[in-house]
UniProtKB/Swiss-Prot annotation:
Subcellular location: Cell inner membrane
Main location: membrane
InterPro entries: ATP_synth_asu-like_sf, ATP_synth_asu_C, ATP_synth_asu_C_sf, ATP_synth_F1_a_nt-bd_dom, ATP_synth_F1_asu, ATPase_a/bsu_AS, ATPase_F1/V1/A1_a/bsu_N, ATPase_F1/V1/A1_a/bsu_N_sf
CDD domains linked: ATP-synt_F1_alpha_C, ATP-synt_F1_alpha_N, F1-ATPase_alpha_CD
This protein's name: ATP synthase subunit alpha
Similarity section: Belongs to the ATPase alpha/beta chains family.
Gene transcribed to yield this protein: atpA
UniProt GO cellular component terms: plasma membrane; proton-transporting ATP synthase complex
Enzyme kind, highest EC tier: translocase
Binding-site residues, ATP: 171-178
Function: Produces ATP from ADP in the presence of a proton gradient across the membrane. The alpha chain is a regulatory subunit.
Entry GO MF terms: ADP binding; ATP binding; proton-transporting ATP synthase activity, rotational mechanism
Pfam family, one: ATP-synt_ab_N
Enzyme Commission numbers on file: 7.1.2.2
Annotated organism of origin: Xylella fastidiosa (strain M12)
Length: 515
């Protein structure tokens, strides 16, 4: 005979059964370290790991998951790994790598993970943001139409850079690439542009010297220095560029202008090649992995000028009517001037122009050693100030004609008057384009120098006196025309009154003969 249960007994029975159930959730977010070598850790059993996820190892050590294989995960360790052993427990965190961002990083030197390394204590209030982010889409971008003044006559006149542009600085070692980048940072002192300098694979002494120079020139207050020195692991050198980009994007997203320098992407590509080979990925051309183009394209595409709508949407209406920009100056080091190597050609094709620095020009004393013939800025022309755009057209033509004629003049015994004048003008333009390091030049002074050479005022000045003449001219101009200088620097306009003032001022100064 079947036992009958009343409702109260049934509910009691169910409660008892529930209490007896032992919940033993299958742990799929833990794995076991099977090998540790050369900064690479292999982990068995992390079935739920995601690409680029942070993996927690013993002693608060983290690794970045890069290879997701059928039964194991290959990850690069961020930091020291001497304490890790085979059999250690590894856990997924569900987070991708993030770094601190915010205004409290300005004036500080941090490592690739955003930790301060300058001995000035902890960072102030910060937020965190992921190091990898999709670049702004086409709809959110605006055309480049505002200038970034480098302070170099040769660059601002012939190869202008705009806010939101990617302009490559390329050349052999010891041709002044870093010097040009640092001078550009110093020139942003009073422009409101925040700067991020990412040092990849450089000597610690070199980085310390750069930081000291920025401090001496009052430029560190608007700059974040991200340092991944040559003594640090390949993983940190690889990540540092993305970390710096994230710090720069913080300002772009909030309707401000930022400038980022990657010094240099050749060393980042070498670090990534090292990681890829250790992870046993198949090598391609020059032993680089197949995705080395994507390595740089996804980084440089994050530099952009974004619209007012983008900024308003990102800040949820807090910032209105402001565009933001992130301008990138990547640096590439070539070997014996070979710009057709794998990484240089990749980055040339990604960027909006390039500044070629040549060893021969550098050794000849022409510094910055810019080769005006093959340097180009594809979008910067629309961002030039009116006055420089109006005056600089003749500079490139004069230099091009001079280089062409100089080659023939070596074989010609006697030259006609026109050719001789073009050669002499070219010599003076070449001399005028020389500039010492840490001597940034304002728009007004650049315009005055270019006007003087274009109108022939330097034709009777000896070539070796051109720079002395220019220095005296600027000093005289600042003493007598302070209001006009401020007007030109603020507006960048060009009109007949300014031309008349330039003409009168140069003629007055020439009569003094005080150079």
């Amino acid at each position: 005979m079947a036992t009958t249960l009343n409702p109260s007994e049934i509910s009691e029975l169910i409660k008892t059964r529930i209490e007896q159930v032992k919940l033993s959730a299958e742990s799929r977010n833990e794995g076991t370290v099977t090998s540790v070598s050369d900064g690479i850790v292999r982990i068995f059993g992390l079935a739920d790991a995601m690409q680029g996820e942070m993996i927690e190892l013993p002693n608060k050590t983290y690794a970045l998951a890069l290879n997701l294989e059928r039964d194991s995960v290959g990850a690069v360790i961020l930091g020291d790994y001497k304490h890790l052993r085979e059999g250690d427990v590894a856990k997924t965190t569900g987070r991708i790598l993030e770094v601190p961002v915010g205004k409290s990083l300005l004036g500080r030197v941090v490592n690739a993970l955003g930790e301060p390394i300058d001995g000035k204590g902890t960072l102030g209030p910060t937020q965190t943001a992921p190091v990898e982010r999709v670049a702004p889409g086409v709809i959110w971008r605006k055309s480049v139409d505002q200038p970034v003044q480098t302070g170099y006559k040769s660059v601002d006149a012939m190869i202008p850079i705009g806010r939101g542009q990617r302009e490559l600085i390329i050349g052999d070692r010891q041709t002044g690439k870093t010097a040009m980048a640092i001078d550009t940072v110093i020139s942003q002192k009073d422009t409101g542009i925040k700067c991020v300098y990412v040092a990849i694979g450089q000597k610690a002494s070199t980085i310390a010297n750069i930081v000291r120079k920025l401090e001496e020139n009052d430029a560190l207050d608007h700059t974040i220095v991200v340092a991944a020195t040559a003594s640090e692991s390949a993983a940190l050198q690889y990540i540092s560029a993305y970390a710096g980009c994230t710090m720069g994007e913080y300002f772009m997203d909030r309707g401000e202008d930022a400038l980022i320098i990657y010094d240099d992407l050749s060393k980042q590509a070498v670090a990534y090649r090292q990681i890829s080979l250790l992870l046993k990925r198949p090598p391609g051309r020059e032993a680089y992995p197949g995705d080395v183009f994507y390595l740089h394209s996804r980084l440089l595409e994050r530099a952009a000028r974004v619209s007012e709508e983008y900024v308003e949407k990102f800040t949820q209406g807090e910032v209105k009517g402001k565009t933001g920009s992130l301008t990138a100056l990547p640096i590439i080091e070539t070997q014996a001037g070979d710009v057709s190597a794998f990484v240089p050609t990749n980055v040339i094709s990604i960027t909006d122009g390039q500044i070629f620095l040549e060893t021969d020009l550098f050794n000849a004393g022409i510094r910055p050693a810019v080769n005006a013939g093959i340097s180009v800025s594809r979008v910067g022309g629309s961002a030039q100030t009116k006055i420089i755009k109006k005056l600089s057209g003749g500079i490139r033509i004069s230099l091009a004609q001079y280089r062409e004629l100089a080659a023939f003049a070596q074989f010609a015994s006697d030259l006609d008057e026109t050719t001789r004048k073009q050669l002499e003008r070219g010599q003076r333009v070449t001399e005028l384009m020389k500039q010492k390091q840490y001597t940034s030049m304002s728009v007004a002074n650049q315009a005055l120098s270019i006007y003087a050479v274009n109108e022939g005022y330097l034709d009777d000045i000896p070539v070796d006196k051109v720079l002395t003449f220019e220095e005296g001219l600027h000093a005289h101009f600042s003493n007598t025309q302070g209001a006009l200088i401020d007007k030109i620097n603020n507006s960048g306009d060009w009109d007949n009154n300014i031309e008349a003032a330039f003409k009168q001022h140069i003629e007055e100064f020439k009569t003094t003969g005080s150079w």
